[in-house]
Amino acid sequence: MAQLEKFLENVPTFDERGNYQCTVLVWQDAAKERFFAVVQDPRCNLVGKTPADFDGERVILADLFPVFVPGLDAIKRVDEALIIAEDYYVKRHIMAPCLVEHSPVANQMFKDTVAIEVEVCHKLMHLEIPNIAKFRGCVVHEGLIVALCFDKYAETLTQRVMRSASSLNKAKVMDRLRTAVSKLHDLGYCHNDINPANIMFASLSDDNPVLIDFDSAQRMGHDLLKVGTPGWCVEELRTSSQENDEIALRNLDEYLTSCGCR
């Protein structure tokens, strides 16, 4: 086995009743191969630990990640040198839940979730919408899309409200977000997970909100592959719907008012 480098995931998993099941560790070696181990420790402390301390099983990436297809309108392929030079944020989808289930259905759902996020972000990228996270392309390994690259942002709306709620112009924030969501709807997609953690700002002084995280996005009327955040979405809805986004925006407006935003 190649020299082990770093942990990528340390994720506790729970059943439908909220009972702890296990903790899944995922790591990557120098050859970019990924491995996972399941441990029975809800507080799994990795201080002083290395992947070599665990009996890992190789992750079959082809079971989980979509194929990168080059072409005229292809998704841009981003290499590590560019990621470092441009200081991009690299989003790696959390594999732990489907690794626990370890079924063809769970694997395909994970693969489809990655694929739809790439599809949505690629289409949005060409519209140059200032209030939607700037997608820069994908990290490709062995012909598979294993991560997405975006511009980095400084803090979430949750963090901004905790730090300086009174400095936020609620009307401006909501107007910009509604415009961004409207553009998404015009393309035939819904976000389905609008909440304060999925809204960011480019710097600590910037007041221009940016909508991020499109792994719950889906074409209107299609079944959701990943449901939104409880309390911010219509939890009983299992299809992609403008209603999900509209309710989330209303909840967001009320949230900002309750936090004392001007």
Where are these regions (language model features)?
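Conserved alphaE helix
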Residues: 169-183
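C-lobe/activation-segment region of protein kinase-like
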Residues: 94, 112, 203-262
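Short, hydrophobic/proline-enriched secondary-structure or compact coil segments at domain edges
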Residues: 16-33
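ATP-binding glycine-rich loop module of kinase domains
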Residues: 32-126
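Catalytic-loop of the protein kinase fold
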Residues: 185-202
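Conserved structural core of kinase catalytic domains
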Residues: 89, 94-113, 122-125, 131-171
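Short, glycine/acidic-enriched loop or turn micro-motifs at the edges of active sites
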Residues: 154, 196, 216-218
